[in-house]
């Protein structure tokens, strides 16, 4: 068994054990060998799943803490607010470190070595996703910079996807889903978000009969998420508790 194969196997073990930080470490080692051989679809997905879990836990924590902070502020509990702000800062530094980690791997290794269109779109979409996660909690100039980097990455991915991938391809659909969420949540452009999501959905519907069996499940799942978001965004009930904007969680789709 080669070192690369061993790291992939260890990453799978770490995933089964739900030790995602270690899964990231193993897959980062694999990612740094792409100068010799590009990541397989399986390896690419393992890397994505590892980072998705590590970042996902912190994003969830940040949202909960931010919500508590708002409630305490509305009650005027200044002592509590000060404690919460410090704690939120700790979570934000973890988020920054994770995002910087994968963005460095993408920039230094994965994007330069990607040759098939599918790989390029996957990695550029991933780059956009992790800049978007930074934009979720950064403020001022840092938020603006993260948002601009997100837009550039998603736009580059979108140009390649439109030219090279079928409208029903799960990676193209996942990109459209996350790009539309970016317009809605980060740029506060609901019209652009709806337009992008609707276009992606309609283009896929028009070619649904060409969808292969292997990606049918993934593609139709992301199409459903696009439709869910469109329903949510076009309704007047976006402030209702329980309404949640959808991102695809599968690596072939979206982060």
Swiss-Prot record:
The modification Phosphoserine is found at residues 66, 189. Coiled coil: none annotated. One of its GO terms (biological process) is cellular response to phosphate starvation. SUPFAM superfamilies: 14-3-3 protein. InterPro entries: 14-3-3 (IPR000308), 14-3-3_CS (IPR023409), 14-3-3_dom_sf (IPR036815), 14-3-3_domain (IPR023410). The keyword Phosphoprotein applies. Component of a DNA binding complex that binds to the G box. Interacts with IDH3, AGT3, GLN1-1, GLN1-2, GLN1-4, SAM1, SAM2, MDH1, METK3 and MDH2. Binds to 1-aminocyclopropane-1-carboxylate synthases (ACS) such as ACS2, ACS5, ACS6, ACS8, and ACS11. Interacts with FD. Interacts with DREB1A and DREB1B in the nucleus. Interacts with CINV1. This is 14-3-3-like protein GF14 psi. It comes from Arabidopsis thaliana. The gene is GRF3.
């Amino acid at each position: 068994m080669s070192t690369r194969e061993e790291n992939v196997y260890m990453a799978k073990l770490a995933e089964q054990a739900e030790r995602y930080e270690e899964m990231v470490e193993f897959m980062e080692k694999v990612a740094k060998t792409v100068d010799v051989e590009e990541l397989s679809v399986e390896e690419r997905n393992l890397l994505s799943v590892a980072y998705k879990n590590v970042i996902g836990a912190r994003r969830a924590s940040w949202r909960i803490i931010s919500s508590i902070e708002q409630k305490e502020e509305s009650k005027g509990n200044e002592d509590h607010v000060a404690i919460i702000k410090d704690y939120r800062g700790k979570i934000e530094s973890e988020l920054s470190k994770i995002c910087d980690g994968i963005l460095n791997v993408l920039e230094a290794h994965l994007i330069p070595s990607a040759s098939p269109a599918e790989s390029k779109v996957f990695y550029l979409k991933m780059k956009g996703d992790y800049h978007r996660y930074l934009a979720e909690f950064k403020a001022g100039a840092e938020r603006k910079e993260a948002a601009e980097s997100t837009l550039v990455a998603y736009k580059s991915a979108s140009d390649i996807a439109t030219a090279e991938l079928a409208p029903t391809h799960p990676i193209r659909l996942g990109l459209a889903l996350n790009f539309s969420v970016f317009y809605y949540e980060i740029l506060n452009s609901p019209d652009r978000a709806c337009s992008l999501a609707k276009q992606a959905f309609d283009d896929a519907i028009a070619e649904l009969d060409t969808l292969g069996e292997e990606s049918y499940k993934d593609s139709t799942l992301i199409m459903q998420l696009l439709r869910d978001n469109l329903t949510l965004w076009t309704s007047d009930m976006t402030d209702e508790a329980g309404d949640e904007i959808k991102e695809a969680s599968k690596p072939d789709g979206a982060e």
